[in-house]
Amino acid sequence: MAPAATAAASSGKGSFDLATLFVADKAARDEAGLALADAVKKSGVEFFTQIGFNDAIVKALNDKKSQSAREGACEVISTLCENGAAQLLEPHVISSAENTPFPALLEAFADKVAAVKTAAIAAVKAIVQSMNPWASFVLLPALLNLIRTSGKWQIKAGSLEILQQLITSAPFQMGEAMPDLVPVLAEAVWDTKSDVKKAAKATLEKAVSLVENKDIEKFVPALVKSLLNPIEEVPKTISLLSATTFVSEVTAPTISLIAPLLIRGLDERPTATKRKVCVIADNMSKLVDSEYTVRPFLPQLLPRLIKTSETIADPEARSVANRAIVTLRRIGKVPAESDGSDLPPLPVAEGPHLATNFVALVKKHGGVSVEQTNPGLAYAGVLAASLVNHHNFDQKTWESTLPPYLKLALPSYDSLPAVRELLQKKADEAETDDAKFPDEEEGEDLCNIEQFNLAYGAKILLHHANMRLKRGHRYGLCGRNGSGKSTLMNAIINNQVEGFPPPTEVRTFYVQHDIDGSEAEISILDWVLGDKRLLATPDEIKSTLESVGFDEVKQKNSIGSLSGGWKMKLALARAILFKADILLLDEPTNHLDVLNVDWLINYLTSLTRCTSIIVSHDSDFLNRTVTDVLHLNNFKLKRYPGNLEDFVQHVPEAKSYYQLDVAEDYQFKLPNPPLLDGVKTKEKSLLKMRNVSFQYPGSSIQQLYDISLQVSLSSRVAILGPNGSGKSTLVKLLTGETEPNLGGQVWKHPNLVIGYVAQHAFHHIDNHLDSTPLEYMLWRYQTGEDLEEMHKANRVMTEAEIAKMKEGATVIKDGVKRIIDELVARKKLKQSYEYEVSFKGMSSAENIWISRDELVARGFEKKVMELDTREAQRLGLMRPLVRREIEKHFEDFGLDAEFVSHNSMRGLSGGQKVKVVLGAATWRRPHIICLDEPTNYLDRESLAALIAALKNFEGGVLIITHNREFSESICTEVWAMREGYLEASGHNWVEGQGSGERIDKKAADDDEVEYDALGNPIVKAKKEKKLSAADKRKAKKDRMARRKRGEEVFSDEEL
């Protein structure tokens, strides 16, 4: 051997006697190994090639006659790794070259000499401990193949030991490789050799420790059991997991453990088990960050789900399966015509190709010419391929991984520009979210945070996200309802975002109309002067207030007199005075009319030193305002340059932020109202206002002048007008929130139910934020009535009304004076009603009936209305106030049962809270739905669903909105309010029933569909109409006439 080695050494530029590494004397071998380490550190990475190192090591490992040669070959690897030459050795040992010694080292695990076997395992461990972690993917296929197929148990056991070392040395990379690891280890646990079985079990336990998902941490032992003993453990584990709420991101280690369980579970026979699997698959898939995470399991999981949806009998379980299929297709980007089993293989980057790219880029950036076969450069190509194939395009990772190996080939060259350009190229090719835009480095940074996390309670909102904000930019923060937009802004203002600059460095202001009810009587000027955060003099404050529309007179008005639009302008005035570096605006156009929205756009676009982060569902406002879009999706925050239109070019599926398209799988459904006594067409008026005028107590200006109008079931009314024109006041008078105080009358049908959502929609739930929507509904409707109705002005008795009622409570009956106690019941009386009245101190047998007009004349109008409301709800066939029915009702508004029954309303997003308010307002099946600014906080998808639901609603609709797109898509009638006067157009007001279609007679084909126990519709046989006696006589006469003519005719009795 020595002559061959010497010849190899002398033929190259380097010189080293390799034979000394394989002599019998161990001390001499060790000395030679140290000498080689010194020599290679001086001469560089190509020294190994020059002396023929790989060929000599492979030859020595295969020398069955010389134990010292085999042992020496293993020892020199360990010596080089332990003495500072590991990085120089890596490109030669870990490569795709045919003469790499790695396979021979693995075969040495089965050497008959124990010392050689021990040295071989130690050598491979030394390589694994010192190598770059991204090289793990190069070694792993060989290890897994030997564990699965080797006929020698020693090699299997040794490979499992190395696998354990890999898990320790490169945990992140091994976590990514879990889809490949788990099946091999689960099989190896059943090996016939106890040593292999024991090693496999230990390795599997170590591998599952890589699962960091807090949702399933406690279930990991059960999941491992189900892998090892599927027949008995799978049903139990599925039951355990089905009760789990997934809130943490689902990564490769997590899905590697759960997917085999789901695949096996779908092969079980019980429908309940299959349904639970579908629920788990759906919930889990929603939290998968990338298609590549779920891709390995699609060929087995998706076809089984499709088969389940086609064969399962229970319709509800079928719908759950279909939901899981839709989610899995979306996450895995599987075409509609594919079942996931025929997906094309993912593109694979090759090390030599990337090494060629490096050669060209080095030359482009002024480097010297270098051969792509250079070990350092070729190995950098291998590592770059490993990064690309595992979709890691993080700049820091590339800059820390590749330059050290490029430096081996080009010691004096700065390789960072070449690495960055290749990273950008590969990221663009992969269409990854990590791709950077050309303007990324332009402008002054206000904040540059990398790898931060954000959670709300147990729910993960952002995971390893980056956020970079430039001075003077206007960022539109986009994402679905519930994705965490408002939570992120609250976290910024409350200093809860790790790495965000403190207030002493960057002044941040949250624009919101946060006016406390206790401050309603304070003047506008005093309220602003009282804000100690504002760095402004009283004169500056006054001039700023004037600049946004608050003249001297208006500054003296109380805050409580401001409409929603003026409150938002006041909040913006405070933001101007705060002199902020960053403005946070959450739905700033809420309650603003068109003119004020234009003013806001002009103001924001004029700011050159102030940065804005804007959350808004007004697509036109965003399109005209923002310079960049921050997209909050899949736990990441990605910046896209340009406005909303440009953003849609980059992310086509985000069109839902820009267009009002109703999604098939996301629709709202409003409950249709019951019939009303005496109402035979949709044109008949149910609510009338005649010559009503109104002025708020304490206000110097009258709000409404001589208003007359009416509302019917066919009404589709848009109430339009500038801020402060009296729109909300008008609606409050119609719904009974307030009462006319300057003359006029408001009349409504005694059984009419109105569903009302106020301008500040959240005021309905403000006192119940720590309750779940379920608990709120149980409280609000606990008596069968709407408890919110009890606080309306038309239900609260004034002192004058109490005095009048007390005076009119005396009834003379049979010469005896009686005092009215309560109104007990009601019944029809011609065109009106009469009411059963009980008397104080008398039994129910003494009750009498009094007409409505008489009771109203006696001052009992509000008591009459109270009884009318109870009767209206009873006639509305109120559904049972139970959990299942409430969950089903909210489901019609896109709110999952999970949020209804298990999440407090404080933790819900703005959009989800609006859905709660909408659901609560429509629980009583209202005849008229009145919505004051309903588009606030709803995303475009929810807005489209609401529009479609209102179009299909069988009752009347009143809408106050500044969103023209919303109003024009629903309303045919316009009530234009201008300085307290009403101009109505497009209406169809009639006296009496009108000429519309009759609604009081049920059509013959309107019978309700009945369902069997599984929910499938029952097709009923039509009942034959029974003949009357006259019909029978007529039929008999007809038969006799036909017989007389010679025809052969028989009756049923004769047959």
Curated annotation (Swiss-Prot):
PANTHER family: ATP-BINDING TRANSPORT PROTEIN-RELATED, ELONGATION FACTOR 3A-RELATED. Disulfide bonds: none annotated. ADP binds at residues 45, 723, 933, 936, 962. This is Elongation factor 3. Residues 1024-1055 are annotated as: Disordered. GO terms for biological process: protein localization to plasma membrane. GO terms for molecular function: ATP binding; ATP hydrolysis activity; RNA binding; translation elongation factor activity. Keywords: ATP-binding, Cytoplasm, Elongation factor, Hydrolase, Nucleotide-binding, Protein biosynthesis, Repeat, RNA-binding. Belongs to the ABC transporter superfamily. ABCF family. EF3 subfamily. Pfam families: ABC_tran, HEAT_EF3_GNC1, HEAT_EF3_N. It comes from Cryptococcus neoformans var. grubii serotype A (strain H99 / ATCC 208821 / CBS 10515 / FGSC 9487). Residues 1033-1044 have a biased composition (Basic residues). SUPFAM superfamilies: ARM repeat, P-loop containing nucleoside triphosphate hydrolases. The keyword Chloroplast does not apply. Gene3D superfamilies: 2.40.50.990, Leucine-rich Repeat Variant, P-loop containing nucleotide triphosphate hydrolases. Its EC number is 3.6.4.-. InterPro entries: AAA+_ATPase, ABC_transporter-like_ATP-bd, ABC_transporter-like_CS, ABCF_EF3_subfamily, ARM-like, ARM-type_fold, Chromo/chromo_shadow_dom, eEF3_ABC2_chromodomain-like. It catalyses: ATP + H2O = ADP + phosphate + H(+).
